Amino acid sequence: MLSKALNINGETGLLAVIGDPVSHSLSPKMHNLALRHCQLNYCYVALPVKPHNLVRAVQGFAAMGMRGFNATIPHKENLLPLMHTLSEEASHIGAVNTVVIDDDGKMTGHNTDAYGFITGLKEAWRSDLSGLTAIMLGSGGAARAILYGLIQAKAARVIIANRTIERAQALIEAMQPYAPNTQLMVAPTQADQLPLESCDLLINTTSMGLKGETIPYIDLARLPHHAFVSDIVYGAHPTPLLRATAQHQLGGQDGLPMLIHQGAKAFELWTGHSMPVELVEHTLRQ
């Protein structure tokens, strides 16, 4: 049985997640559970950091000897120029969500979001994602990481459906150099413009569903029976999209596995230990 109390002392290391806002984050619960399980003397906290304070905050983290931190909205892109080194994923995606600080205060920026999405998807659906056709709704920061992950997994075709065609096109232009074998396309958010019949994987990267709203231009009845639906929104109850997915007897998952697996990768980068993923997911879903 894990103790619920953190044993903080003079040698306790500090880890954190920064954002604005950040009080809703599940990361402290996830990481502190894993730290206790692995008997590691760290504490993970959520720190609200306004955009105009980002540079000072990051400099302070290095000065005080923090081991590292996560970043969420709105800081992922703005961390790029503050890093001493970037991982290949962070450089290609154009965003940092995990920072490792060495003993000299040097910071390496990583992006574990693509890994988190692909790992969760493989566990829930199928281990080989090569050759698939995916339709992705949205072109924001999460979409950028997920698209990179699909390219690395050798998807054959990814269609980005977005209300603003120009934003989707800009995302494709940014990712095209890394996608020699993946066809990237743009489609408007109109039912008759989406080739759902040939879709293997439907991904919602937008916030639609967070407040219980449906996605009007998606007719799940048009998907083939083998298709899988991934909605990166997560909460106490399934989104309307995932409820409809179950009604159509399709496979699907919410965004919690992505959150957990990106966190597990960050945890390993900081500590060298593996996160107890099953324990964490069971706890977060209670």
Curated annotation (Swiss-Prot):
Active site per the UniProt annotation: 76 (proton acceptor)
Keywords from the named record: Amino-acid biosynthesis, Aromatic amino acid biosynthesis, NADP, Oxidoreductase
GO CC annotations on file: cytosol
Biological process per Gene Ontology, one example term: aromatic amino acid family biosynthetic process
Enzyme class: oxidoreductase
Family to which this protein belongs: Belongs to the shikimate dehydrogenase family.
Function field: Involved in the biosynthesis of the chorismate, which leads to the biosynthesis of aromatic amino acids. Catalyzes the reversible NADPH linked reduction of 3-dehydroshikimate (DHSA) to yield shikimate (SA).
Binding site for NADP(+): 88, 138-142, 162-167, 232, 255
EC number of this enzyme: 1.1.1.25
SUPFAM superfamilies documented for this protein: Aminoacid dehydrogenase-like, N-terminal domain, NAD(P)-binding Rossmann-fold domains
PANTHER family: BIFUNCTIONAL 3-DEHYDROQUINATE DEHYDRATASE_SHIKIMATE DEHYDROGENASE, CHLOROPLASTIC, SHIKIMATE DEHYDROGENASE
Source superkingdom: Bacteria
Catalysed reactions, semicolon-separated: shikimate + NADP(+) = 3-dehydroshikimate + NADPH + H(+)
Xref: InterPro entries: Aminoacid_DH-like_N_sf, NAD(P)-bd_dom_sf, SDH_C, Shikimate_DH, Shikimate_DH-bd_N, Shikimate_DH_fam, Shikm_DH/Glu-tRNA_Rdtase
Organism: Magnetococcus marinus (strain ATCC BAA-1437 / JCM 17883 / MC-1)
Protein name: Shikimate dehydrogenase (NADP(+))
Residues engaged in binding shikimate: 25-27, 72, 97, 113, 234
UniProt KW Oxidoreductase keyword: yes
Pathway, per record: Metabolic intermediate biosynthesis; chorismate biosynthesis; chorismate from D-erythrose 4-phosphate and phosphoenolpyruvate: step 4/7
Molecular-function GO terms, alphabetical: NADP binding; shikimate 3-dehydrogenase (NADP+) activity
CDD domains (alphabetical): NAD_bind_Shikimate_DH
UniProt subunit comment: Homodimer.
